[in-house]
From Swiss-Prot:
GO terms of biological process kind: phosphatidylethanolamine biosynthetic process
PTM: Is synthesized initially as an inactive proenzyme. Formation of the active enzyme involves a self-maturation process in which the active site pyruvoyl group is generated from an internal serine residue via an autocatalytic post-translational modification. Two non-identical subunits are generated from the proenzyme in this reaction, and the pyruvate is formed at the N-terminus of the alpha chain, which is derived from the carboxyl end of the proenzyme.
Location of the active site: S212 (schiff-base intermediate with substrate)
Protein name in the entry: Phosphatidylserine decarboxylase proenzyme
Lineage per the UniProt record: Bacteria, Pseudomonadati, Pseudomonadota, Alphaproteobacteria, Acetobacterales
Major location (coarse): membrane
Class of this enzyme: lyase
Length: 244
């Protein structure tokens, strides 16, 4: 099977027919993926409504079933396979890129006032909402800041909305920042990471419920490889090459 080089990554070419079959299988696996633990109270609520509906109205039953199915879809947590190569910054979330531009990291992280490249990913209600670590390293700081709930696809969401910011120091001493940002519908940011945690690229660290945004600030001097409008797959899509 032929190989060809695409940038700095070697890609194995796949026949079109087989590629389509693989894509279909991957899509089915993603939809049927088990839910994130954060779904538990919502699933219990949906099932409870359906059970109560058995004694009241079939419409209530269907409402409970529909809500339960939606939660199973929204909170799906598919497995991801990070690239085998080290020295890469990976997407911290699924969605599509709404902004690639220099910006100053959140002041609460204490990373200084020098702008660095920021890649902002918008997550619609149809995207997987599990957040993943973009690099190997140590979580040096986590800072939560309350805020508004404006449309997460807008740039001002990075400044005005409720957010939870993490600083991750890589083994070489450089720092990457990831910011979980609540959106117009999302009203709950969950972060399982703790300061001092040693993490691996692609590892799960949290989830944002019902539509949101995730910003990633690259180390100073590192230029992103992605563009606005590009689709991101958390834990798999390469955002930047961190090799000095």
């Amino acid at each position: 099977m032929p190989l060809y080089s695409e940038g700095f990554i070697t890609v194995r070419s796949i026949p079109k027919g087989k590629s389509a079959q693989m894509s279909m299988v991957q899509s089915v696996k993603m939809v049927l993926a088990p839910p994130h633990p954060a779904a538990r109270p919502f699933l219990i609520g949906g099932v409870a409504v359906a059970l109560v509906g058995l004694f009241l109205s079939h419409w209530i039953v269907w409402l409970g079933v529909a809500f339960t199915l939606f939660c199973l879809f929204f909170f799906r947590d598919p497995e991801r396979v990070p690239p085998g190569r080290t020295g890469l910054a990976l997407a911290p979330a699924d969605g599509h890129v709404v902004s690639v531009a220099p910006a100053v990291p959140p002041p609460e992280l204490g990373l200084g006032d020098t702008p660095r490249w920021r890649v902002a990913t918008f997550l619609s209600v149809l995207d997987v909402h599990v957040n993943r670590m973009p690099v190997d390293g140590t979580v040096t700081k986590i800072a939560y800041r309350p805020g508004k709930f404006v449309n997460a696809s807008l740039d001002k969401a990075s400044e005005d909305n409720e957010r939870n910011a993490l600083a991750i120091r890589m083994p070489d001493g450089r720092t990457v920042a990831v910011v979980q940002i609540a959106g117009l519908i999302a009203r709950r940011i969950l972060c399982d990471a703790r300061e001092g945690d040693v993490v691996n690229a692609g590892a799960r660290f949290g989830i944002i419920r019902f539509g949101s945004r995730t910003d990633m600030y690259l180390p100073e001097g590192v230029v992103p490889l992605v563009t606005e409008g590009q689709t991101m797959i958390g834990g798999e899509t390469v955002i930047a090459d961190l090799t000095p």
